[in-house]
């Protein structure tokens, strides 16, 4: 896949009712590698992949045009991106349509991601601990942000987090000049996406999310949280209802996050 394929890839994703804007495609394409399937009518399939250091990678944006599904195109595209990634342990988020294909090529379920979205009109003020404050993410926070992302996911995140800073707004929880949590928000699809949200515990995660739901009250918001996050009922009360879920899968070994910090919401279903 090259930059010249983005317009056609965007049309393909719209045809299967995925909300990505052309700018959303451009962001993820710049960060990774990908392959397309074409015929005389044009582009009919896509698959992208992203390396996270030398041991881990993720796969996403695996799409086949409706009229061409069930003809082995998805399997061929997956084989190409898997070859691109070599011996890395590979993560992905599977829709119901793709889950069986991924299971047949060695992926196993390790969790779920729940997609919440909607509009928040009244955002609660969540208290922090003494000495803690939420402040804007600064340019000098890059190394701290990368370290926090690596601890929360168990994978190197410097490249992804740096790229996010170019397209997203960010806030951190600062405790005596130590960054212990972060949340980012960017334009995505029909409105805005919150993620990642990284925090030591659920109360601080709620404080970070509340910052953005308050700042962007009345706007359409989306957040994808882990099924074990405990945030579902609270998000629903805010007005961000669950509309879909996908299965988190891995081929190989899953990364081992630091137990002292947790990624409550992912960046997106492609990058994790």
Predicted regions and their residues:
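Conserved active-site tyrosine of GNAT-family acetyltransferases
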Residues: 102-103, 107, 235
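Conserved N-terminal entry element of GNAT/NAT acetyltransferase domains
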Residues: 1-3, 120-139
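Short, structured loop/turn "capping" segments at alpha-beta junctions
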Residues: 110-112, 127, 155-160
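Conserved catalytic-core motifs of GNAT/GCN5-like acyltransferases
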Residues: 89-93, 108-122, 242-254
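Intrinsically disordered, low-complexity, positively biased terminal segments
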Residues: 2-7, 38-39, 51, 55, ...
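Active-site-proximal cofactor/substrate-binding loop regions of enzyme domains
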Residues: 1-89
């Amino acid at each position: 896949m090259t930059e010249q394929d983005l317009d056609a890839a965007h049309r393909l994703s719209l045809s299967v009712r995925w909300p990505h804007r052309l700018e959303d495609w451009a962001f993820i394409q710049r960060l990774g590698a990908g392959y397309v399937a074409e015929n005389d009518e044009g582009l009919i399939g896509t698959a992208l992949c992203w390396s996270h250091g030398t041991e881990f990678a993720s796969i996403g944006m695996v799409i086949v045009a409706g009229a061409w599904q069930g003809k082995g195109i998805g399997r061929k595209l997956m084989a190409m991106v898997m070859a691109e990634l070599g011996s890395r342990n590979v993560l992905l988020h599977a829709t119901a349509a793709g889950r069986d294909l991924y299971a047949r090529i060695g992926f196993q379920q390790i969790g779920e991601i729940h997609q919440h979205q909607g509009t928040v009109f009244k955002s609660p003020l969540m208290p922090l601990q003494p000495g803690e404050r939420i402040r804007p993410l600064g340019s000098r926070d890059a190394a701290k942000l990368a370290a926090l992302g690596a601890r929360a996911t168990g994978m190197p995140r410097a490249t992804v987090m740096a790229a996010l800073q170019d397209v997203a707004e960010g806030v951190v929880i600062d405790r005596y000049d130590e960054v212990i949590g972060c949340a980012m928000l960017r334009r995505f699809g029909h409105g805005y996406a919150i993620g990642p949200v990284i925090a030591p515990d659920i109360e601080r995660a709620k404080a970070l999310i509340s910052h953005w739901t308050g700042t962007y009250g009345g706007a359409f918001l989306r957040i994808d949280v882990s099924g074990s996050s405990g945030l579902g009922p609270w998000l629903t009360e805010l007005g961000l209802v669950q509309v879909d879920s996908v299965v988190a899968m891995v081929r190989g070994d899953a990364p081992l996050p630091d137990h002292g910090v947790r990624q409550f919401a992912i960046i997106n279903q492609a990058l994790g």
